[in-house]
From Swiss-Prot:
Protein name: Interferon gamma
Record's function text: Type II interferon produced by immune cells such as T-cells and NK cells that plays crucial roles in antimicrobial, antiviral, and antitumor responses by activating effector immune cells and enhancing antigen presentation. Primarily signals through the JAK-STAT pathway after interaction with its receptor IFNGR1 to affect gene regulation. Upon IFNG binding, IFNGR1 intracellular domain opens out to allow association of downstream signaling components JAK2, JAK1 and STAT1, leading to STAT1 activation, nuclear translocation and transcription of IFNG-regulated genes.
Positions bearing carbohydrate: N48, N86, N120
Family: Belongs to the type II (or gamma) interferon family.
Assembly notes: Homodimer. Interacts with IFNGR1 (via extracellular domain); this interaction promotes IFNGR1 dimerization.
Keyword Ribosomal protein: no
One cellular component (GO) term of this entry: extracellular space
Localization per Swiss-Prot or TrEMBL: Secreted
Residues recorded with modification Pyrrolidone carboxylic acid: Q24
Keyword tags: Antiviral defense, Cytokine, Glycoprotein, Growth regulation, Pyrrolidone carboxylic acid, Secreted, Signal
Tissue and organ expression note: Released primarily from activated T lymphocytes.
Superkingdom of the source species: Eukaryota
Classification via InterPro entries: 4_helix_cytokine-like_core, Interferon_gamma
Amino acid sequence: MKYTSYILAFQLCIVLGSLGCYCQDPYVKEAENLKKYFNAGDSDVADNGTLFLNILRTWREEGDRKIMQSQIISFYFKLFKNFKDNQSIQKSMETIKEDMNVKFFNSNKRKQDDFERLTNYSVTDLNVQRKAIHELIQVMAELSPAPKIGKRKRSQTLFRGRRASQ
C-alpha cells in the first residue's frame, strides 16, 4: 500500500514535468507576434548590441536590478501606449502588460497605477515642473537611507574576564 502511493506520486511528477515542457508563459506567444509585426527577428536588429540585456546582466543586487527594471518597464509601457490604437497587436501588448503587472508589480493594481502615473508626467508641463521642484527636498530626504536605530552590542570581553577570573 505504501509503495503504491509512492508510485502514483512519481507518475504524477512525471506527468506534470512533461506538461511543463509544452506549456509556455502567455507572453512568449504574444512577444513572438510583436517580433513579427516590428520585424524584430531581422539580422540588423542586433547591430550595436542590446538595449536592456547588458544593463540587466551588469547589476546583480536586487535593489539595483529593480531600479533598472523599473526604467525598462517604463519604456515598454510608453512603447505600448504609442501603439494602443493598432488593433493587430493590441491583444499582444495587453497580454504582455498584464504579465509584467504580475511579475514586476506582484499583481498590485495600485502599485502599477502609481507607476504609470509617474511615467506619464510631462517634464515640459510648467505646473509639473513647479510641483517637482517644490517637493525636491522631501524627495531627496526619502532617498537617503534611514538611520539605524538599534541596541548597542555589549562588550563580550567583560563577561569573558569574569569567567577567567573565577
